Amino acid sequence: MKITKNILKAEFIKRPNRFQAYVKINEKIEMVHVPNTGRCKEILIPGSTVILREENNENRKTRYDLIAGYKGDMLISIDSQIPNKVVYEALMNFKIEILKEYTNIKREKTFGKSRFDFKLEKENGEVYYLEVKGVTLENDGLTMFPDAPTERGTKHILELIDVKNKGMGAGVLFLIQLNGVKKFTPNHKMDKNFGEALKLAKEKGVDILAYDCLVEESSISLNNPVSIEI
């Protein structure tokens, strides 16, 4: 998917809270919005180069969103709104192998008391619920989720097990917001409960998928499947 708004580079200064950061643009310090509640501490390092997206909205306190950052030569997308958009584009273009037969794609659908990112249907009426998680944490080719404790994430995994137990298809797709990685694994040290829930989901037949992305400063798209170790 293309990012159609104005994109520019800046130097990262600091992040005083989850939603705000300070950057330097042409020697001027400016506050920007961070569209990611994760820690991203391996990416948002003082002095590093980050990518901003200009938001032309007079009602905003900040002019820019901080949407990506360079970790060495590697560009990592950190915009938490991006994964669902990338996966939707991939689903519409039948790029996810095991989901190619699902032709009716609906976003943000509920099942019981649960809300999932996607509800997919085949022409024969078979239903599949898909949850998407964005991944930004990487170390020497190993990617992990989450980078902060996530009760909500664990709840989603357990709800997918319930979907599967009721006879429908269920899966979670970890969208790795960078390219050229070797493996994905749950971050047991950060959130043991999430890791255990994911292991149980796999045992119960929930599909566990991971894909990396082709990331450029003004575009991002689904790339290749990544091996998973749970």
Swiss-Prot record:
GO terms for molecular function: DNA binding. Signal peptide: none annotated. Gene3D superfamilies: 2.40.50.580, 3.40.1350.60. CDD domains: SfsA-like_bacterial. It comes from the Bacteria. InterPro entries: SfsA, SfsA_C, SfsA_N. Belongs to the SfsA family. This is Sugar fermentation stimulation protein homolog. It comes from Clostridium botulinum (strain Langeland / NCTC 10281 / Type F). The gene is sfsA.
